C-alpha cells in the first residue's frame, strides 16, 4: 500500500466519504435501514462533525479517501461517554494496521474532549472490526447504551479511556 495520512475531514471529502461508507455497507450485506447507511449525516459529514466534542478523521492516500472514523457524544445519553462512529475502510487497506492507527487517533481525540468511556455498536458478522475493537481494549456489553437509531446493530462494546 502506498503512503497515507490520517487527517480531519474537509468539506471536499464529503462525497468520497459517503460513497466509501455506503460501498462497505453494501459489500458487507448490511441492511439499509436501521444502520449507518440511512444516516442523514452522510450527506454532509464535515458539517455533522464540525461541532463541539465531535471529530471525523479520514485516511487519505494519493488524493483518495480509503477509510474513516469519528467520535461524537453518545446520542440520548447523559454522561461522559462518546461513541466511535462510522469506522469503515476499503477492502484493500484492511488488516494492514491502518485501523489500529485510526483507533488510536480517535481515542486520543476522545480523551482530549474529556470523555471517560467510548462506546461502539456493530453488526455480529463484522468479525474483523470486532477483533480490532477487542485488541484495542473494548469489552462486550449485554445491551445498547443511548439511542443511536441503529437497531440492527446487536453487538455493543465499551472502553474506559
Predicted regions and their residues:
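Short amphipathic alpha-helical segments
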Residues: 2-5, 85, 116, 153
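Conserved glycine-rich acetyl-CoA-binding loop
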Residues: 64, 77-78, 86-104, 111-113, ...
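Residue-level signature of transmembrane alpha-helix interfaces in integral membrane proteins
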Residues: 26-29, 45, 99, 137, ...
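C-terminal "cap" of GNAT-fold acetyltransferases
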Residues: 20, 116-119, 123-161
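Acetyl-CoA-dependent GNAT
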Residues: 4, 8-91, 103-105, 109, ...
Amino acid at each position: 500500500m502506498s503512503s497515507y495520512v490520517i487527517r480531519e475531514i474537509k468539506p471536499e471529502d464529503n462525497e468520497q466519504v459517503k460513497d466509501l461508507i455506503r460501498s462497505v455497507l453494501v459489500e458487507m450485506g448490511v441492511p439499509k435501514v436501521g444502520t449507518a447507511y440511512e444516516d442523514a449525516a452522510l450527506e454532509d459529514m464535515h458539517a455533522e462533525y464540525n461541532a463541539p466534542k465531535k471529530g471525523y478523521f479520514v485516511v487519505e492516500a494519493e488524493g483518495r479517501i480509503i477509510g474513516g472514523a469519528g467520535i461524537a457524544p453518545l446520542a440520548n445519553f447523559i454522561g461522559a461517554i462518546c461513541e466511535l462512529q462510522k469506522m469503515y475502510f476499503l477492502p484493500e487497506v484492511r488488516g494492514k494496521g491502518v485501523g489500529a492507527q485510526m483507533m488510536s487517533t480517535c481515542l486520543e481525540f476522545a480523551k482530549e474532549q474529556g470523555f471517560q468511556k467510548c462506546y461502539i455498536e456493530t453488526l455480529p458478522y463484522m468479525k474483523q472490526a470486532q477483533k480490532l475493537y477487542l485488541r484495542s481494549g473494548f469489552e462486550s456489553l449485554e445491551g445498547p447504551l443511548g439511542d443511536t437509531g441503529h437497531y440492527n446493530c446487536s453487538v455493543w462494546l465499551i472502553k474506559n479511556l
